[in-house]
Regions:
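Hydrophobic alpha-helical segments within and immediately flanking transmembrane helices
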Residues: 49-57
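Transmembrane alpha-helix interface/packing and boundary motifs in multi-pass membrane proteins
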Residues: 30-49, 125
């Protein structure tokens, strides 16, 4: 075991001690994805980054990657759905709220994106940073049919739930391979130096 691997394992062990266990952990991941997708709240919560990190942790034994993906997808869907309902029910009134008023530029960007791409914007908008939570809100306010919204939102949430924790998982696998090959490469260089000296 290399020193770097030992330090990583010790750091992860300490981190795991602070994280909740079992169902509570998956609820936390679901809430993070929910918040990331909720109109306005997603600006404050780095849900994508946290879900990538959770995928990395799953590789190292913190929970099941499959359950993690499901929790992230379900949370993302419900955040979208609530944003859609808020847009349909309260659209302009909610935009008058002091906090959202400061983000009208993002609402306008979401409106333009929705006008250009229609229902597909619900699917693709999830992957466009700051406007992510505003797209479902705008779709609801624009009177998008709920059935069409649900189809795009379910597909988008499933892909997001798979992509972000999956990215963390595969980054961890790649990191392990880099560490393994770095160690071997170092030995080859050392052997070459010994032979030449």
């Amino acid at each position: 075991m290399t020193g770097g691997t030992g330090r990583l394992e010790e750091t992860l062990r300490q981190l795991f001690a602070y994280l909740p266990e079992g169902v509570t952990y998956y609820l936390l991941i679901g809430l993070i994805a929910f918040g990331e997708s909720l109109v306005g709240i997603g600006l404050l919560l780095p849900g994508s980054t946290l879900c990538v990190f959770a995928g990395f942790l799953a590789l190292h034994g913190k929970g099941s990657i499959v359950t993690l993906i499901a929790a992230a997808a379900v949370g993302a869907f419900w955040g979208d759905f609530l944003s859609f309902v808020l847009g349909a029910r309260f659209g302009p009134d909610l935009l008058a709220h002091r906090w959202l008023k400061k983000r009208l530029d993002l609402v306008r960007k979401a409106e333009i994106f929705f006008a250009e791409h229609g229902g597909k914007s619900v699917f693709f908008g999830r992957f466009f940073g700051p406007i992510r939570g505003f797209i479902p809100f705008v779709a609801g306010g624009a009177g998008m049919r709920p059935a069409a919204f649900l189809g795009y939102a379910i597909l988008s949430a499933a892909l997001w739930g798979l992509a972000y924790p999956g990215l963390g998982w595969f980054a961890g696998v790649s990191w392990q391979n880099v560490q393994r090959w770095t160690g071997r490469f170092s030995l080859l260089i050392l052997a070459a130096l010994v032979v030449t000296v």
